[in-house]
């Protein structure tokens, strides 16, 4: 799983500099941190709604969306995935 997340992190960091008309990450980044944070919030709510509805497939899909958008936000904050994982290890 870590390899998948590290690959995603690398892709997100590369695409932040891409043409916004060609990359969702670049388009979202161009809209600013507030919009990225809003997307994280939306995906979190959608994940909770799916969970409360006992919608397993929905919860999986929304969790993937949540992780993706959280990683876009972390990249915008210049926080490496390793830093978050290290914090989890400390806990």
Predicted ranges, named:
Residues 1-63, 67-91:
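Flexible "arm" and connector segments at domain edges
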